[in-house]
Amino acid sequence: MTPRVWLFDLDNTLHDAGRWVFARMNGEMTRYVQQTLGVDTAEADRLRREYWQRYGSTLLGLMRHHGVRAAHFLHETHRFEGLEQNVLGHRHDLAAIARLRGRRVVLTNAPRAYALRVLGALRATTLFDEVIAIEDMTMFHQLRPKPDRRMLRHVAQRLGVAPHQCVLVEDAPENLRAAREIGMPGVWMQRFARRGAHAGPRVARWSQRLAGVRVVRGLARLDALR
C-alpha cells in the first residue's frame, strides 16, 4: 500500500547540514549557554553536549534545569547570517519527492523560521503540504520533540492517519527506532552521513537494531516503496 503521508526530517535528510549549519549551530548554542548561565566556554560546551546526550536536545536540558524559554533559545541560536548561500541539497532527491503520491510533510526539531529558510534556499517550499516544526511539538504544556513517541502518535492523529500509514524519512536512527515502536515505517537516509572510520560498523549496528527500516543513500527510489 502506498503511504498516505510522507514525513521528512530536514537537517541531513533534505540538505547537507553537516557541511556548514551544524558547526555554527553548536557554536551558537555554546555561546547561548555561556551568556545565559554565566559560565566559561568549556563549561558551556560541556553542558550543551551533556544535555543533548541525556535529553536528545540541548534545549530540553536548559528548560528543565535552568528555566530557559524555548522561543528565546530557538531565536538566538538559529539566526545564521549567510544560511541561504550555504544550503546544499541534491536535485535527484528533490525530484524524487516531487513524484511521490500522498501528502508530504516536513517534521523537524528545528524552528519554523529556520526550516522555511532552508526550504526556500532549496527551492522546495512548494513540494511540501505542511511544515511541522518544534513549535508544534508541545503536548500537555511540555515540549516533546523527536524522538518522543507520544508526539509521533499525535502527529499521525493530527494528520488524520494511523502511524502505519506514514513513512518517516530520517537521518537519525534514534528517531526511526521511536517511529518503529509505534508501528510507523521508516527510511534511514544516508546521503549526508559523515563517513568516518567507524561509519560502516555504526550503520551495521543500527541496522540490526532497526529491523524493517530501509537504508538508502538517496531518495530516488522512495516512490517504489509499498
Q: At which residue positions do the language-model features occur?
A:
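Short glycine/serine/threonine/alanine-rich loop segments
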Residues: V39, V68, G102, V161, ...
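Residue-level marker of regulatory loop/turn positions in helix-turn-helix DNA-binding domains and
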Residues: G89, L107, R144
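Asp-based, Mg2+/Mn2+-dependent phosphohydrolase catalytic module
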Residues: M1-R4, A98, P111-R112, L116-R226
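N-terminal helical cap/lid subdomain that shapes the substrate entry/recognition surface
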Residues: T2-D93, A113
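Hydrophobic residues in well-ordered beta-strands that form the structural core
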Residues: D16, V106-T108, W188
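Short helix-to-loop capping/linker segments positioned immediately adjacent to catalytic or ligand/cofactor-binding
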Residues: Q85, R104-V106, F140
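Catalytic-core regions built around general acid/base machinery
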Residues: H92-R101
